């Protein structure tokens, strides 16, 4: 079953958790195994925190076992574009100019919301420096590649987010879009992306 879990949508995972046909721990283990297998070629992640992810998944599993899920995403693995503050992890925005020592003590609002709903935040995805271009390379992390053709770009600036989803390294990712930074990589990798409205 664990191999099959990487092909499930967030909605399908929630149904499996509710019916006790799979657990959040099984889901995140499947994703982490997939990242280990695929990301050495794709380079979608700047950070993956296995220990934190498993701890979050165990907490989620306990809530599901008690019939008390925390919110709309409880137990669903999600990655965060490295432009958004994420408590406990550096946010480097693809740049060598930001000191990774931190302190990193708060979540961006979008990260806080998915955390409040029980999502299992497992890693941060790559982006070009400060999101200034529509491809996925920077001096900090190197080149992020399109999973469908490693000689091609996944687009940008949410390069790692789109590449991760296309390669089944998690069902959900938070990206950011001011001028195409979700829409471009979504179109380049064949995944579904939403640019939220302002306000």
Regions found by a protein language model. Name each.
Residues 72-110:
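Enzymes and membrane/adaptor proteins characterized by extended Gly/Ser/Thr/Asp/Glu-rich
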Residues 104-199:
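Short glycine/serine-rich loop segments
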Residues 31, 53, 75, 81, ...:
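Conserved hydrophobic/aromatic pocket- or pore-lining residues that grip, position, or stack substrates
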Residues 51-58, 118-119, 128:
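Long amphipathic alpha-helix in the N-terminal Rossmann-like dinucleotide-binding domain
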Residues 60-77:
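Immediate post-signal peptide segment of exported/extracytoplasmic ligand-binding proteins
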Residues 1-49:
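An N-terminal boundary/leader segment
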Residues 13-17, 57-60, 161:
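Generic hydrophobic alpha-helical segments
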